[in-house]
């Protein structure tokens, strides 16, 4: 008995392979109960932050991940699944979909951040980390504080002498 590979499935396999190719930040979401407009809104917000969203077939996604030697927890690929990838700041993308979790039926299944598997709780904690801009701003204020304090002290000393 010969096995005939469906050309549509083969095409989906190739598209998914390209979709996650060289991406280290991949998230799996359950979109059950979301309307088309909600899913489109989520997609637009994610794409606005240099991410991408794709509805996938679990079996094909499993084959793609297996070919890429990525071990994923089976619970991530059960039920309706959306895969989200982040090119730059993955925590910004995670914040976007956690904003949707608060107001919709969207559920986070897990994901990979820099190649390491994160369960739902870790992804949620990761989403609360400051962005790159926020971190730079915080670092700059930490560097500025001692200098500002020195200037105020010297000014107060000069005022006392006068």
UniProtKB/Swiss-Prot annotation:
Keyword Ribosomal protein: yes
Keywords, comma-separated and alphabetical: Ribonucleoprotein, Ribosomal protein, RNA-binding, rRNA-binding
Database matches in InterPro entries: Ribosomal_uL10, Ribosomal_uL10-like_sf, Ribosomal_uL10_bac, Ribosomal_uL10_bac_type, Ribosomal_uL10_CS_bac
GO molecular-function term, one example from the UniProt record: large ribosomal subunit rRNA binding
Role description: Forms part of the ribosomal stalk, playing a central role in the interaction of the ribosome with GTP-bound translation factors.
Protein family according to the UniProt entry: Belongs to the universal ribosomal protein uL10 family.
Subunit-structure text: Part of the ribosomal stalk of the 50S ribosomal subunit. The N-terminus interacts with L11 and the large rRNA to form the base of the stalk. The C-terminus forms an elongated spine to which L12 dimers bind in a sequential fashion forming a multimeric L10(L12)X complex.
NCBIfam families cross-referenced by the UniProt entry: PRK00099.1-1
Protein's recorded name: Large ribosomal subunit protein uL10
Species assigned in the record: Borreliella afzelii (strain PKo)
């Amino acid at each position: 008995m010969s096995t005939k590979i469906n050309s549509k499935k083969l095409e989906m396999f190739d598209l998914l392979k390209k979709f996650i190719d060289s991406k280290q930040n991949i998230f799996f979401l359950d979109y059950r109960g979301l309307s088309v407009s909600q899913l489109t809104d989520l997609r637009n917000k994610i794409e606005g932050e240099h991410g991408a969203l794709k509805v996938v077939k679990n079996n094909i996604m499993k084959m793609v991940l297996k070919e890429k030697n990525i071990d994923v927890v089976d619970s991530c690929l059960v039920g309706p699944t959306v895969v989200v990838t982040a090119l730059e700041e993955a925590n910004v993308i995670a914040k976007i979909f956690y904003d949707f979790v608060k107001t919709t039926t969207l559920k986070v299944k897990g994901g990979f951040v820099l190649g390491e598997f994160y369960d739902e709780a870790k992804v949620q904690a990761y989403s609360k980390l400051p962005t790159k801009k926020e971190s730079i701003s915080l670092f700059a204020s930490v560097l500025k504080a001692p200098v500002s304090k020195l200037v105020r002290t010297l000014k107060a000393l000069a005022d006392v002498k006068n």
